[in-house]
Regions:
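N-terminal organellar transit peptides
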Residues: 1-131, 138-223
Length: 223
């Protein structure tokens, strides 16, 4: 499927006219076949259509690889669009419905979004918890639907070993928690003390509370 980006009818007509000569705009091809993505695969929970990405799944290394690739490729295409048609491209719209997962996978997507030249708007569809909130809060504009919720909490870890191994693990967790708190401090309206207290709990916040805490900018109301 050929993908088009436009901001007005005039630009749309120009793209359609030129695409007849050069074979169309190069599509993004991630993976899959005629029967769609295999169940449980990364593309089973990541869907790309034009400048919209639907991410409904775990924040894992496998899923982050596909998600990051999609964001980078759309960003590249939209920057080509900007130069070629001298028109501001639409933002990348990233819809998130995820209970979280790996903090390292989340950090990788955070860096991809922060390095995008095209604005990335994040939308909470249903829920965003744990590592998924790190991804959502770094968007240039952050939206949440009326009946959606968010949850932020401390890191979890399980291990066995010698006493020194546990000391090393605590140092590792302290390092990661410092980075997590830094992201929330920079991207929300919460104070350091407030962040520390909230992270101690496993408590869901509704859309109104998310706006109050600065986790999102705006509620998308129904109707």
């Amino acid at each position: 499927m050929t993908r088009y980006y436009w901001c007005d009818d005039k630009t749309k007509e120009k793209i359609e006219e030129e695409s007849q000569d050069d074979g169309g705009v190069t599509p993004i091809i991630l993976m899959g076949g005629p029967d769609g993505p295999p169940p449980g695969s990364a593309m089973d929970c990541i869907d790309v259509s034009d400048n919209v990405i639907m991410f409904y799944g775990e924040v894992s290394e496998k899923n982050a690889k596909v998600l990051n690739k999609a964001i980078r490729m759309i960003d590249k295409d939209l920057q080509v669009f900007k130069v070629k048609y001298d028109s501001e491209p639409p933002p990348i719209k990233l819809h998130i419905n995820s209970y979280g997962g790996s903090v390292f996978a989340g950090f990788s997507t955070v860096d991809v979004i922060l390095n995008c030249k095209t604005p990335v708007h994040t939308y909470i569809d249903g829920s965003a918890a744990s590592a998924a909130t790190l991804i959502s809060v770094v968007g240039d504009k952050r939206f949440i639907y009326e009946h959606s919720h968010m949850l932020i909490h401390q890191l979890s870890s399980a291990m066995w070993g010698k006493f020194e191994d546990f000391k090393d693990e605590m140092e590792n967790l302290d390092l990661l928690m410092t980075k997590i708190k830094k992201i929330y401090k920079e991207k929300t309206s919460m104070s350091t003390r407030q962040i520390t207290e909230i992270l101690k709990r496993d408590k869901w916040f509704d859309a109104e509370k998310c706006v109050e805490l600065g986790l999102v900018d705006e509620i998308v109301e129904n109707g």
